[in-house]
């Protein structure tokens, strides 16, 4: 007699399980996230591949005093791609599980294939694809140049077969492309379902820790920009990297939103070319290329991403509104922050912006959320409103408070040094930060207490 199947409902956001459908998840509070999955009644909770492996390993587990554990940061493996190493915190940690997410066509597979190319020069690397054939991967690899014989390909989606190959071949690095295509025979649901993604990730986690090899897994993203599948997926891995950018543009930005072995503030900048992804060593110069001359509403500001200062062009367009409700649009920065700064300008400087449309854009498509760009947004709006260009060789940074004061920001000396290196002659910054940058020569420093002082300069 065939075994029956029972229905369970999983939350797509957090992976919470319920016996019946609910409108709101009691675990994470999200609405309309439960999906139904059919499970064999013969497979009970706790009898999947990973849980059986866990019970077997418990018998052999040994406790070790913390004082006897040796940890050497030199054990990190450099990928040879400096922008990626920067985001990872200095290289790949052995035994780590890294999730790489991003929109389709953004370059996730290309980046990981380039990592495999670098590491296969002196390590045995296994690239497992569930989406492409070996011939398709070879066509993509031909654009990048020659590959070492240490790079091996496996086109498979069955979790049990993949686990057996990894344990047999013992590679020094594994890439899984992608986690949504993997499935286990022990889980009675379709590939890409909540239970399949969770089970597959758990198995790869055990392989990474047990064999002490780094495992990279590619994850698709939803329309909201988060990794598809249960939210618990991001909790299970050691590092979560997001590949951002417009696939119709050439630049790409790699961000770490979770990193157990490094900072989550660093970014890596790449440019997509015919031969693959090329590192952009000086993002500031890249972001400012093509800036218009003597244009009102344009100003250069400086933001810090991790330890790296990046100069960006902030553009604003303020014009009379023909509608009863003026339009406010922000691209690359927080929309509510723009509204707040415009309210400060109206209240503290008496600017009549209530009947004006306002459009604020961070040129190049990069997104900045640091408060240090507040003063740049204010200056760009005033410049456009009064139709007065700001000197091209001037850079600004500072946080703006509700009283109109310009507050200090961190690392002002690095910001000024970056501006000087790129040929800027004047820097408008918070007055309280002047004493920290007085040692830098060759650039004129103007300290301001409030936005009124800054606006007088233009």
Regions found by a protein language model. Give the residues of each.
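Divalent metal-dependent catalytic cores for phosphoryl transfer on phosphate-bearing substrates
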Residues: 134
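Peripheral, non-AAA+ core regions of ATP-driven protein-machinery
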Residues: 3-13, 17-86, 93-99, 106-116, ...
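P-loop (Walker A) phosphate-binding loop of NTP-binding proteins
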Residues: 103, 130
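Conserved RecA-like ASCE P-loop NTPase motor core of nucleic-acid helicases/translocases
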Residues: 125-129
């Amino acid at each position: 007699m065939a075994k029956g199947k029972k229905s369970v409902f999983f939350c797509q956001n957090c992976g919470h399980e319920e016996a019946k459908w609910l409108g709101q998840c009691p675990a994470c509070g999200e609405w309309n996230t439960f999906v139904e999955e059919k499970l064999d009644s013969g497979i009970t909770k706790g009898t999947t591949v990973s849980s059986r492996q866990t019970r077997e390993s418990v018998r052999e587990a040994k406790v070790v005093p913390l004082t006897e554990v040796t940890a050497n940061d030199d054990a990190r493996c450099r990928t040879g791609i400096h922008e990626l190493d920067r985001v990872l915190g200095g290289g790949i940690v052995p035994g780590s599980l890294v999730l790489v997410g991003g929109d389709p066509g953004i370059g996730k597979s290309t980046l990981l294939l380039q990592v495999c190319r670098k590491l296969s020069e002196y390590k045995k690397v296994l690239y497992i694809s569930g989406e492409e054939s070996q011939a398709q991967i070879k066509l993509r690899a031909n654009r990048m140049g020659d590959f070492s014989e240490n790079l091996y390909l496996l086109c498979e989606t069955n979790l049990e077969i993949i686990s057996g190959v990894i344990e047999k071949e013992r590679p020094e690095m594994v890439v899984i492309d992608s986690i949504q295509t993997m499935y286990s025979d022990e889980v009675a649901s379709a590939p890409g379902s909540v239970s399949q993604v969770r089970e597959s990730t758990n198995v790869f986690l055990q392989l990474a820790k047990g064999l002490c090899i780094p495992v990279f897994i590619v994850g698709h993203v939803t329309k909201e920009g988060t990794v598809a599948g249960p939210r618990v997926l991001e909790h299970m891995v050691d590092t979560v990297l997001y590949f951002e950018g417009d696939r119709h543009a050439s630049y790409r930005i790699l961000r770490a939103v979770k990193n157990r072995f490094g900072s989550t503030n660093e970014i890596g900048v790449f440019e997509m070319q015919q031969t693959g992804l090329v590192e952009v060593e000086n993002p500031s110069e890249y972001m400012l290329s093509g800036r218009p001359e003597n244009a009102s509403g344009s100003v250069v500001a400086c933001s810090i991403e991790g330890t790296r200062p990046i100069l960006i062009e902030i553009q604003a367009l303020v014009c009379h509104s023909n509608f009863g409700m003026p339009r406010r649009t922000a691209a690359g920065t927080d929309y509510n922050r723009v509204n707040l700064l415009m309210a400060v300008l109206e209240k503290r400087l008496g600017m009549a912006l209530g009947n004006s449309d306002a459009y604020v854009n961070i040129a190049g498509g990069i997104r900045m959320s640091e408060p240090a760009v507040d003063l740049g947004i204010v200056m760009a709006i005033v410049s456009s409103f009064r139709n007065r260009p700001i000197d091209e060789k001037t850079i600004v940074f500072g946080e703006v408070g509700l009283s109109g004061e310009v507050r200090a920001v961190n690392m002002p000396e690095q910001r000024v040094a970056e501006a000087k290196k790129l040929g800027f002659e004047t820097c408008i910054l918070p007055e309280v930060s002047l004493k920290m940058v007085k040692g830098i020569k060759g650039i004129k420093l103007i300290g301001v207490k409030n936005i009124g002082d800054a606006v007088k300069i233009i």
